[in-house]
Amino acid sequence: WPRCCRGSPVAVAMRAGPVLRLCAHPGLRYRQGQRPGPGTREYFYYLDHQGQLFLDDTKVKNFITCFKDVGFLSFFFEHLQRNRSGRYEAEFPFLSRCGRERNFLRCDDLPVVFTQILPGPDGNPLLSYCGGGARLAVPFQPGMLAVFPENGRLYHPAPRRAGGVGLVRSALAAEWSSGFQFGEGSERPPTHFWWEGTWYRLSGELLGILRAEKS
């Protein structure tokens, strides 16, 4: 394995002892660490709506059992892309490669979940995602926030390779909830957002991407 893969938490566990676990979802069978070909291993992951990453077959998914190593998380999500490998594309729509290692990902919602806001080096805030701190962050764009009417969740632009849009964690969305203005009535998505002394008109540009993603 390349160094990045050899040092991953899963790879370390594989070397320490057998962790091959058979998973059988309806119509789906896989084994963590399976070898579909010489020199190739496959692992399967799940991302919840709080931005926590787990091995897909972890029975109890909570803060204790999620991955927390920033180096691993950063590498995993920096290399995340649509799964066009020809394997598990419907069940695991995203894939993070590390050399010949394939890391398949399915999500509760989207493969990017913004979890905290950080100060940026130029004074402009950053929005960090999936536990990566400043290593996984994009510039915060208040005017691009969007509430998706079908589920009431809040979204923000994300890296293009991961679909271009990410979910804002519910706790962070709740912190910002008082800043939204509903200029077209409470039954419609908000039209403006108050941030650091400025009203931002919400463009709604992400709504089309979200509808296509969830159709």
PLM regions and their residue ranges:
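Long, non-globular segments of proteins
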Residues: W1-S215
